[in-house]
């Protein structure tokens, strides 16, 4: 093991070897001379003449024979022969130098131990011996120089090398001692300083009283039950943590799809007789596709639906076989009120096409009664979808827009109805949700259900997300309810919408009047004579794009030509000049100029927020003001002609790079839920509508009162006085 004294030992070992070689010179080893001249070799203990043919005995100093041998050659040495013979005795210094070097080498070996190496005195002795050894070695070399100059041999130079090594060993011994002394002096200074030595710290620690340890009761050790003897499990749990491959901060917010916006993925089912697409059904969950909690059963779009009248009360008598939920009917289209009441749509009709299933009358004149007030039960839940069944007239001939005889089809509803655009063969959610079994009575024809009037449907919750369909602009419905998308130029302009422009296609489809395939206009639904009270069941005006009939109103308004110039009306951007002239000069069926269907220009207004044109409203409900013409738009006479603007001057209808071109075209965040009503100023319960005078008159007229239930099982209490239908509504959905 290396120690600080190791270099010292190495140097002294080398010096001792060199001095030993010089001592063993001629005549002991004839090959090692200290000096050589005219065939005579010199050593420490004698000499040899005639090329080592004859040697002197081993002794200290040279005898008289050397002088005789060098009688004629003595003048060639620097010293006379007598002086050289006297100095030859000093050659004994070579063995002394070797001996001192050996002693110093032994001391250096002892300095490798702990006690001598940490003793300043021992190292001091080593250093002193080293100095003495250096002096002796130096003296031996000087004797060689004096005796043999200028005929020195290589043996004398070995003594010089040994002298140098002894000097270096003395320096090493001095350094060792100096290091040790400095270390001890520093330690002494530290011991004298109480703060540096830590004495004060330990004194303070000793003064602090340690609280006695509490003796906890020992629990007896039971083999296999408790105790550290049988518990060989580690006292702590170790876990391995893997580095995340991707940080959450680097994941885009739109990486996860919020919901399946089109759950009705269509596929062919070979088991279906009609060969149409099936509607897949997902398992019910506690939330809809937008994350909003639901209380009742939902359809495939996550919209809450309530069961139909027959599904909610399968044990009721009559059903739609002529009796409904009220008294036995004697004909007419009425099949009973919606769920929650027991009155019909009026008194039974008389006469008509003949008896219906289980009924005693046929298709008679229109009923003369009003709507029966609600009796037992409650109003249908919001979003209730009335049962859509075929009309009894199918047995006698299909009405306009219906299928072949005996085939049941779903009665088309308004665009706002939940069943809009859906296949007639699609099963309802209410029947699937309540597990109603198919009975023979389900195949019987039934009169169509009038849709609710506009404004009577419950307002959707504020803040609920609504996904717009790509073609209709309404909540998504199966795609088979619309005609297939034609080749490019469907929306005009020679530009095809991409698949990502779903919202734009839906808005353009609504504003250009594209209707679902296979359905007829609302004006063709009612084929019978309607009485004055029956106007309550008429459908509201269909949505008409804004500014479509302004030209018609302008033509009927005196001075309209002077207010708005025809060139200043919005025209399609990609329409040619010929199309513009035709659209301005050729009046349509309603007297308004015909709009070009090749236009890409559309109003950037959501359909449900657009105000219908007053000119297209039907007969106004009694008690309400008639249609009003919007005020004229006073534009400067010399204003720019928007029809003359080339493509690209306005906001484009579609974009090649981005799905959205303006803020109004951006979709609604499907995951946004509004705060409680108490935290949203301006949002509160809708004000109650004032009762209509005509409704009050009809309710007070006994001719429009429905009789109480007759023949019901167990009977039922008579209708409570004071009940009436909701003002402004065509359905007896609840109490006022």
UniProtKB/Swiss-Prot annotation:
Residues 240-251 have a biased composition (Basic and acidic residues). Belongs to the palI/RIM9 family. It is a multi-pass membrane protein. One of its GO terms (cellular component) is growing cell tip. The chain crosses the membrane at residues 9-29, 90-110, 123-143, 152-172. Disulfide bonds: none annotated. Residues 201-210, 254-269, 473-482, 513-540, 573-586, 656-667 have a biased composition (Polar residues). Required for the proteolytic cleavage of the transcription factor RIM101 in response to alkaline ambient pH. Residues 316-363 have a biased composition (Gly residues). Its main location: membrane. Residues 201-226, 240-500, 513-736 are annotated as: Disordered. It is found in: Cell membrane. Residues 30-89, 144-151 are extracellular. Residues 1-8, 111-122, 173-736 are cytoplasmic. Keywords: Cell membrane, Membrane, Transmembrane, Transmembrane helix. The lineage of its organism: Eukaryota, Fungi, Dikarya, Ascomycota, Pezizomycotina. The keyword Transmembrane helix applies. This is pH-response regulator protein palI/RIM9. It comes from Pyricularia oryzae (strain 70-15 / ATCC MYA-4617 / FGSC 8958). PANTHER family: PROTEIN DCV1-RELATED. Residues 448-461 have a biased composition (Pro residues).
